[in-house]
Amino acid sequence: ADMVPLTGVNRTLLRRGLVELANSARPGVVALKQVSGISGGDVSAGQVGFRLGPRINAAGRVDYGVKVVELLTTDSAEVALRIARELDEHNHERRGLEAQVLEQALEQAAAAFDGGARHSLVLAGEGWHPGVIGIVASRIVERFYRPTVVIGFDNGAGKGSARSIRGFHLVEGFRRCAEHLEKFGGHEYAGGLSIRAEKLEPFAEAFESVARQTLGADDLSPLVEIDAILRFSQVGFSLARELEILKPFGIGNPEPLFMTPQAEVRERKVFPAGVRYRLRDDGCTLSAVVFGAGDDYPGMPGEKIDVAYRLSENEWNGSSAVELRIVDARPASAGSL
């Protein structure tokens, strides 16, 4: 499973493929959906990307990819369920390996970041599993917003995976550091490389030099691109269901991102996975949630925030409500739109 632009033929294939996945009676598909916690009718692109895909990929990351072929070609429901459960176990194992490497990589990144002075991050460790370094690189970019290379070494031989940010062409960056690499490939935002341990420091210095020459100060802060500014009175089931027509969302067809300025925080609750709010604007009050946030996230009761969000329908106890999934927020200023 991989990520591709969801435009043109790709989007058509995915729309039809999601229908096939939802209706398929193939034992392997049924079993994979079962262990992934997907039940009921429709299958979404998000469920493919975050539930089915990781279990398919986990086989090749920690075991052998042929298991996926066996799963999808068997006519036996019993065999399919056994293999699907194995893939689910591999995915849990992959997540454990990812957590271990991510913890070490975050420590290195925090030490190297130097208060934002670095324009790039090259992180490495002995024994870091090659099956998870790409995921770890993505997590580091999410946290620090720098072109990031994560390398796992085994007896002096390193395999690296990299992720980039807007304005820095990764493979072009590698090309300018090619004297330190055994081989490399990829595209603008993702790539891979092979490197010897003795070349690690020279490569990191050269890569940082290229990043400094390429990226200005404004490039080092993530840009939130808003599709439309809305008042809460414009937000409801009608809009949410019109957006359904635009699905499936993904690369090349991103889910619309909205912004409401100066929303008043009525309630706020921090919970293990993030922060929940009740926000009020234009005479309407809506629920909102941001995942992965903590006590320091903007917006205390009584304050006003500018909030960027996507829409979702939240079903609970048999009732539905439109909820805001917060992407970014900042304290509202007098100059807010």
Residue ranges of model-derived segments:
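Hydrophobic helix-and-loop "lid/oligomerization" segment in the mid-to-C-terminal part
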Residues: 1-199, 229, 269-271
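Mid-to-C-terminal polyanion-binding domains and interfaces
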Residues: 79-85, 89-123, 168, 175-337
